Amino acid sequence: MKSRLGVNVDHIATLRNARGEGHPDPISYARQVMNFGANSITIHLREDRRHIRDEDVAIFSKIKRVPINLEMAANNEMLKIALKYKPNFVCIVPEKRNEITTEGGLNITKNKKIIKKVISKLNSKKIRTSLFINPNIKDVFASKELNAKCVELHTGKFALKVKNNKNYLVEFKKIKKCALLAKKLGMEVHAGHGLDYKSVSYTHLRAHET
């Protein structure tokens, strides 16, 4: 399958909120990246609303041109919002209030009960669910057990090692191994966090060599 690009516009909203005005507008920027060929748009509604807000989710939910991927924590408040606006995808992510951005994958074992509940509710409304996980085999199997339709593999360590010209092959092999397993188990595979032109081009060049 051909690779697809999803673009996260959260930090356009961060700039807007810092200015205290209506611009820059994440909706306008989303339209621009769609014009340039993006295959989907990602927004993260955090519990503290530090960038994307509820009203943004309402507007993005009306976009039909490309799929909308809503990132959110696994809790009842966010579940209610997702069921109201029905995005194409929901990616369940961990959240810490003191983090600048999402720092790692879900602790599925610790949060299994609430994650299972959220996935079940979303699946019943035909909203495709994804779990944001670290690239390890255990979490791929756990995601399948919870009936997630997709996994998003955390690429942060890989991207950082590429940026610093360190030994990134080990991290790449972890991601590839998990991606192949998830696909074999019937799940769609997404990958994200910290990727840029250099790290993405590396994955393309090395995909058939390792």
Q: Which stretches of residues belong to each language-model region?
A:
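Hydrophobic, well-structured mid-protein blocks that either form specific transmembrane helices
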Residues: I92-L146
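Conserved N-terminal beta1-alpha1 strand-loop-helix module at the mouth
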Residues: M1-I68, N75, L83-K86
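Conserved small/polar residues in nucleotide/adenosyl-binding loops
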Residues: T203-T210
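Active-site beta-loop-alpha junctions enriched in small/polar residues
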Residues: D10-I12, R46-D48, E71-N75, E95-R97, ...
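Alpha/beta enzyme core
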Residues: D25-S40, L83-E95, I137-K157
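Hydrophobic faces of well-ordered beta-strands that scaffold small-molecule active sites
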Residues: L5-V9, I41-I43, I68-L70, V90-I92, ...
